[in-house]
Amino acid sequence: AVTCEAGILIADLEQAVRADQVVSGGQEILMYPSTRDIATIGGFIAGGYAGAGSVRNGILKDAGNVTMIRVVTLEESPQVIELHGADIQKVHHAYGTNGIITALTLRLKPAIDWVHHIGLFESYSDALRFGCEATIAIGSRIDAFLITAVERRIAPYYTASFGDRFPTNKDAVFSMVNPDHLSEWRVLLAKHGGTESM
């Protein structure tokens, strides 16, 4: 677990727990928003629900993902209180309307050097079928941190980053896959008519 102040950028927190060798190879936070590089962990807890990593680790409010939140209450004589267990839900996803989050404790897992992968499909339906089966397989035969179906109309927005790896005539599934499970991932991709572009 890691205890941190609410104002730390999620990207900085992730870098710190990966660098800390309390666990050989470092650790990683369980989930983060797509705005990881500019978002604070306190903002994510106050307004977030899920994100990259949720397909593997659940959502923020699931028991044990956040184990402590320290809050300054919004009352005439503010108090500093620490919430644990089910009491965390009193301020999680409340957008700061009932207290100011100043610190929190998050559960961690051993870090994995996730493989960023793009699978291309002839139809969005094929991409969704693949994504659904891959999601169901998590925990039994596949380990993935992210599985996101992306419709072809979005492809032009990725040209600068991905070039021809996401062409406008294909639908895609963006994913982060455990390298130890990549061969099984590729078998499942082929089963659904997908091709690997990254």
Locations of the language-model features?
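Noncatalytic alpha-helical scaffold of FAD-dependent oxidoreductases
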Residues: 1-198
